[in-house]
Amino acid sequence: MFIGQSVPKTVQFADPQNPSINQLPRKMALQRAYQTIGGSCQWYAAAVVENQGRYRDALISEYHKYPALVPVFDFMDDKAPDKVRKMKKVWTEDGYILFWTAPKADTEMDKAVRYVVYRFGNKEKVNLDDPSHIVAITRNPFYKLPYETGKTKYRYVVTALDRLHNESKSVSKKLKL
């Protein structure tokens, strides 16, 4: 289930239990308290773009800090694509690029249409459920790496998404950047 949020009403009216703030914190807490709620849509979009009541600022800084994956439509298809292949770091005139090959697919529904790139510290445990590690969601089978001093070790992890947002198993590579 997805909830429709009226941006003007949310920022215009005070929280009944804390009149010094608007309703956004309580609405977000309530929405996140129920596992059956998959997210929300904001109405009307121009109010978000115009940043009415600093609504957009709050979404960016507090509630949606990190990229997110669209919920899986597993009631239509729950088969994830195969994992990416041949992942490697290549030096180009634009710097280091992480390249990979799209997985093979038997049907159109199994084709990879996007890739998720995660970055973890060298000794950090890989946790794909933590969106703070997502550095890119891309249609391209490559990612420009942020080269630093060449001494810091990272683990990059790439997964493939099909058109119904099923996520493949991960492939990882340790890199010095």
Language model features: what each stretch is:
Residues 1-75:
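Substrate-binding cleft of secreted/luminal carbohydrate-active enzymes
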Residues 144-168:
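Beta-strand-rich modules
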Residues 103-129, 153:
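Solvent-exposed loop/turn segments flanking beta-strands in beta-repeat/beta-sandwich domains
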Residues 133-139:
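Short beta-strand segments within Ig-like beta-sandwich modules, predominantly Fibronectin type-III
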Residues 54-110, 163-177:
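Pro/Thr/Ser/Gly-rich low-complexity, intrinsically disordered linker/stalk tracts
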Residues 10, 49, 124-126, 167:
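Flexible, glycine-rich phosphate/dinucleotide-binding loops
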Residues 5-7, 41-45, 100-102, 121, ...:
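Active-site proximal loops enriched in glycine and acidic residues that flank catalytic Cys/His/Asp
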